[in-house]
Amino acid sequence: MRCPTCQYNGTRVVDSRPADDGNSIRRRRECEKCGFRFTTFEKVEESPLIVVKKDGAREEFAREKVRRGLIRACEKRPVSAEQIEEIVNEVERELRNIGDSEIASDLIGEKVMNKLANLDEVAYVRFASVYRQFKDISVFVEELKDLMEKNKDR
């Protein structure tokens, strides 16, 4: 690995430990020429997930889009950044475990909604209102009734 300071190609690993719940390895390196220490992360390169949108368009799965939607839905709610990140990780892991390289955007939205329903009902309703694009208030009220019915079953 090339030193970011002097560009010398020889470095040695000083320390190595798991990071990101074991999904990557954090390494402290030291340049053999100038002695500069820096950190690198090693992660398995995964094949891209392709999201098939409702109009048939295809784009690469973007964790950041899922995270932004969750942050917006959870604004001013008692949901931590760690909980949001855990949902993003779980959704991506579940999508990859399907084993298909192309995933319908509907499936992503449904998985996120299911996670939110178990975490925070207000955030769930916020996310659902944007994701499902309710045409009028009656559809929105129906969704609330369904949520209340599910709560009775718990």
Swiss-Prot record:
Negatively regulates transcription of bacterial ribonucleotide reductase nrd genes and operons by binding to NrdR-boxes. Residues 49-139 form the ATP-cone domain. This is Transcriptional repressor NrdR. A zinc finger (unnamed) spans 3-34. The lineage of its organism: Bacteria, Bacillati, Bacillota, Bacilli, Bacillales. It comes from Listeria monocytogenes serovar 1/2a (strain ATCC BAA-679 / EGD-e). The gene is nrdR. GO terms for molecular function: ATP binding; double-stranded DNA binding; zinc ion binding. One of its GO terms (biological process) is negative regulation of DNA-templated transcription. Belongs to the NrdR family. It comes from the Bacteria. Coiled coil: none annotated. Keywords: ATP-binding, DNA-binding, Metal-binding, Nucleotide-binding, Repressor, Transcription, Transcription regulation, Zinc, Zinc-finger. It holds the Pfam family ATP-cone.
